[in-house]
């Protein structure tokens, strides 16, 4: 798999913004960022892709797979796509420029 296709987009939600500042509040110098990643990506590929894109080595990667919800449109059932989300921990308060994604 090409490393440029591993990271799809950053996830910017209230919960992910709270994760970025939780390390400062607990007295640690760690920062957590959340990304939507390719469904076939594993933790090693995610680390390599982030190192290539941002020149920062992550200390920890946690991955979760989300199943698409069943929805109805005009009484016809359809399913939203499945996706994978990665919560990546960086040490020493690393700041990432999301314009590169």
Curated annotation (Swiss-Prot):
GO terms for cellular component: ribonucleoprotein complex; ribosome. Keywords: Ribonucleoprotein, Ribosomal protein, RNA-binding, rRNA-binding. One of its GO terms (biological process) is translation. SUPFAM superfamilies: Ribosomal proteins S24e, L23 and L15e (SSF54189). GO terms for molecular function: rRNA binding; structural constituent of ribosome. Coiled coil: none annotated. The keyword Plastid does not apply. It comes from the Bacteria. Belongs to the universal ribosomal protein uL23 family. Part of the 50S ribosomal subunit. Contacts protein L29, and trigger factor when it is bound to the ribosome. One of the early assembly proteins it binds 23S rRNA. One of the proteins that surrounds the polypeptide exit tunnel on the outside of the ribosome. Forms the main docking site for trigger factor binding to the ribosome. NCBIfam families: PRK05738.2-4, PRK05738.3-5. This is Large ribosomal subunit protein uL23.
């Amino acid at each position: 798999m090409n490393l440029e296709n591993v990271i799809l987009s950053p996830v910017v939600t209230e919960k992910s913004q709270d994760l970025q500042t939780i390390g400062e509040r607990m007295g640690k110098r760690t920062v957590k960022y959340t990304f939507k990643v390719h469904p076939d990506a594993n933790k090693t590929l995610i680390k390599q892709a982030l190192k290539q894109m941002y020149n920062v080595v992550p200390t920890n990667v946690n991955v979760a797979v989300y199943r698409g919800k069943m929805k109805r449109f005009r009484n016809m059932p359809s399913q939203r796509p499945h996706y994978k989300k990665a919560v990546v921990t960086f040490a020493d308060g690393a700041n990432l420029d999301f314009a590169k994604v």
